[in-house]
Amino acid sequence: MKLLIMIEKIAALDIETENTGADVRNDNKRIISIQIYNKDISEIYYHDSKEKGLKLGKERVKSLLSSGYSFVGYNVLNFDIPLLKEFLDLEIPLSNVIDISQMNKVVELKQNFKMYKLEAICAEIGVRCDHKKLLVPMIEKLKQDPKIVERAKIEGSKIASLKSWSLQFSQDRALDLICGGSAILQAYNEFVESNGNTNSIFHQYAMGDVISEYELYNKLKRNN
């Protein structure tokens, strides 16, 4: 009697966007890259590439779906999946999506310890997420730009009135988001100018996200 062993087909999926505003969801202007990763796949497709553009990335995702793959990601149901549909008309069935942020241990960490960011969850679970530090020098420099500081104050004031948050908290959050998004875009432009150099900050940052997500999913799954 032969035993059939079902091999789980899983890959982590992540996108980077152009968003230099203070609204994580509604200020996105375009998708700039798609990253896919598992132990056999390590791929990045980006907007300004002639060889590995987003159209090819879209077809790659569809091909993996047709071969039975499911995709994992952090907060993927609220961010990556809807934005892929909005900007690339790429619809990924929810039955083929696993959102790490909704796994039991992560929900517990969010509720009990107020941990929300990928890097905080990774640190708690024991998964490397060092790539997040790559953008820190860029972000800190941008925070010294008077024009950005003034814009953050204006955007923060709007957020405070809408969310009933304190003015200082809202302005600090707006500054973090504006500078974080601007740093990603700056790193991306340098990546494009380098013809997709794998040693560039953007490549390390973007692939770092998807690798951390894949490793986090597998560790959480083993410990469930």
Predicted regions and their residues:
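Entry/capping segment at the start of metal-dependent catalytic domains
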Residues: 1-35
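A generic hydrophobic-helix recognition signal that picks specific residues
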Residues: 7-9, 73, 92, 202
